[in-house]
């Protein structure tokens, strides 16, 4: 698993706006389509995955939607943006840089050997992560991992 922080200008610009609402932007997929004959203008389509330690509710998604649409319109130079905002759920972690966002959450990691471990994410940096399983911390270098996935606890 590689560690490569997302440094694209559009991602950073949107992440800053999302942080102002107390959330983290985990992933942003963004595209601008060609000019449509019907509407005679280009349109943007985006999907944002956000995280908040207190949970991502419908209200949080709506607030992020309202604040992100104008930013995406400006970045894409389009008047119309179709934006979908959602929580990470049981997200497969695609990049080791995402681990720092999910500190304190339960994750399942798979090793190159085919074995796996479930634990609470206690620490993450550029080279390794630390899971706490049964009160015992285990440090795991990213090079030993093939896959990782969130296992969110059910919140009442």
Curated annotation (Swiss-Prot):
GO terms for cellular component: cytoplasm. The keyword Cytoplasm applies. Gene3D superfamilies: RimP-like superfamily, N-terminal (3.30.300.70). It is found in: Cytoplasm. Pfam families: DUF150_C (PF17384), RimP_N (PF02576). GO terms for biological process: ribosomal small subunit biogenesis. Keywords: Cytoplasm, Ribosome biogenesis. The keyword Cytoplasm applies. Belongs to the RimP family. Required for maturation of 30S ribosomal subunits. This is Ribosome maturation factor RimP. The gene is rimP.
